[in-house]
Amino acid sequence: YRYPIEPLQEQLRRYLGTLTMGDLWQAEPATDLVTTTFDLLDNRTRFVKPWKAEYAPWPVVQAVLASCAVPTYFPVIAGRYVDGGVGSYANPCYLAAYEARFCLGWDPQETTIISLGTGRLPRTLQPGMAERFWTWDWLMPVLGAFEQSAADQQVHLVDTFFDQLDFRRFQVDLREPIQMDDVGQLDRLAAYGVELGHMILDDQLDRAMGITALRAPQPE
């Protein structure tokens, strides 16, 4: 891996201290925080919640670390947990809608879900380029396809099956690829943040919310 986990862990402890997931649920008012992490040993996504007995003792620091331990960037947490985005929930809007409706029992007509994207990757491939790919050239396009398809799928699921929710998804189009650890791009990322902020103020929704079902013609 590229980076040790200790500096991030120390900063999280500085702000979160010894707070546990269970403490969030016992607070007044109770707070539901759902973090996802992929369990390599069980080969499944785990949903770490403060009201689940098995996760109540977890320090919030551990839940955050387990949720953001990107493979090859950070070490595996507790020998089994990596970034929750490894599964289908890099965009957790469907998870949030499900939690609110079926776990917390909230009235969907009284519930607003705001989903903020981290940037839609630009289209950089030109016709014929893929025909000249070496084996390793396929890695990023395939990973990008999985990630973007899963993210758009979550939006479509919420928009289709939770239609009574006030659901709003905002996403900004990146004009160039930016590596997640490229600190030299912080100013550019901040500019994208301002752009996303204007989209929120203008209620300019992600185009993934425009996906609609095309009805098949009736057979004659």
Name every feature range the model reports, one short phrase each:
Residues Y1-E220:
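Patatin-like phospholipase
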